[in-house]
Structures are given as structure tokens and as C-alpha cells.
Amino acid sequence: WIRLVLDRHKFPYTYIRDEDIRMGGLKDRFEVILFGHNYLDLQSQIHGIDKKFGPMPYTKTEKTPHLGVPDASDDITGGIGWTGMVELEKFLNAGGVLITLGNGSALALEGGLVRDVYRKSGAFFTPGSELKTKFLRTDHPLAYGLPEVTSVFRTWMPVYDIARSGRGGVIMQWGTKLRAEDREPEEPEATLTKEAREAKDKAKKEEVKMLVSGALKGEDELEGRPAIFDLPAGQGRVIAFNFNPVHRYLNRSDHRFLWNALLNWNALPPARGQAK
């Protein structure tokens, strides 16, 4: 789906294989690496198809003329492996930009390429929902041309949070309110004056609900959690989306986030917490 979007908009790119990442020298060849959404757990994102099934060629032959496109490999087992993870770390340390989409963000957020981010546990579920979001850094290039409060399409995938010291790296959050644990405790109803009760009722009616369309379970658990990260990694950075802006070429209104990331890769402000 990423290739379809880039091809249709005539956006130039180089398709790279697991072997290309393991080979190293990434910063000598690329400024930005885009890692797409997938439905794999972290182990499978790193190690790919089990090597016990290899070698497993993906090449064009007389018997398989339809294979080997857009690229070929003599063995597609093994994934990028730990060697590839080390090479991605070198790429970031040298100033490269890694952009991860949807569940593909687990590679960076859970794979150790950034710090202070952790998977959030809780009873939340977004099976395919349009949700309200809010930019916390409206001056960031990822927010160019967009209102402070907007909405994006989110399917089911992990939810992440970040240590308080790293929250400057959150560009956009889910919903428009503070996290539940950051809100002031409400006064007991019985202690409120009539005016205070009326003001509370009015505020509740005017409250912006997160769900725009679809289904949502555990809104309070998701409220205020990061939707887009911009995190330091060595001299480089990781732009991690907690949704997939190119979901099957259906959510075209979300392509804007990807374009902002790709077109402004060399105009990003210093990542919060990054050594100068």
C-alpha cells in the first residue's frame, strides 16, 4: 500500500530488502527510511520467516515468472535480524530519520531504538474507527496545514505511552483531554454549589468526544496517549505513528501526515531531549 501511494503521487523512493539493511552503510545511501504497518509481533518484525524454512527464494524463473517484483531475493527468511537492528541504530546515530507507521512502530518503540516509551496495557479496542486527535505541538512540521484538533482513522494495534520526562516528544495525542491520571479529581456532587453544578453540566455537554465514527472501547484509557511521536535517537530521530496513514489506500485524508513527515524530513526542529 505504501508503494501504491508513493507511485500514484510520483514520489521517488528506493525499495530496500532485508539484505540491504543487514549490509549496512545505510546513512551513506539514505537520509530517510520508511518502515510500514504490518500485523507482525516484534519478534517476527526483526527475524522474519524462520530460517529453518530456508533458503526460500523469491525470484523470477520460467516456472515463477510472476515473482521477483519489485525486487528479488535468493532467500527471504531471517528478516533483518539483530545485524539489521544494529545497522538501523548506526543509521540513527549518524543522523538518519526513521519513519514508522502503525504496528510497524513496534520495531523502534519496543525494539530499543528509542528510550522511555512503553506499551500501555488496558481494555481499549479500535476495530476501525475515526477518532479525534489534538496536536500538542502546533508549530511542528508534522502539523503543517492542519487544525489543532483533527481526526484520523485507527485500526486495532498496541497503544504506547512515554515517561513524563519525554512527553515533549509527543506531537499529537488521542482525544482532546488530559490523561485520566493527570486530571484534577472531581469534587463530590453533594459539595457543589448550584452554579458549580450548572457549569459542570454545561462543560460536559460541550465536551469533545473522541469517537467520530465506528466503534471504540476504553476511551478513557486511550485519551491523552501519544498518536505521533518525534523522538531523539543518537543524532537522528524516529517519527512513529500510532496509526497507519495509508490503510489500504482508504483513509486518504490521513496521507497528509505522511507527506508532512516525508517533505519536511530535513526541516524538523531539534528533537526534544536531543543532544546538540
What are these regions (language model features)?
Residues G104-M210:
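An acidic, glycine-rich "communication" segment
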Residues G48-K52, L113-Y118, H255-F257:
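Short secondary-structure boundary/capping segments
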Residues I2, G84, G104, T138, ...:
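Stable alpha-helical elements in mature extracytoplasmic
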Residues P12-I21, R119-F124, G128-S129, G273:
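A generic structural motif
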Residues F30-L107, Q235, F241, A261:
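Short alpha-beta junction capping motif
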Residues D7-H9, Y15-R17, P141, P147, ...:
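Extracellular ligand-binding/catalytic regions of CAZymes and related secreted enzymes
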Residues D20-R22, L34-L42, L98, G104-L107, ...:
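Solvent-exposed loop/turn segments at secondary-structure junctions
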Residues W1-G36:
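N-terminal beta1-alpha1 cap of cysteine-dependent amidohydrolase-like domains
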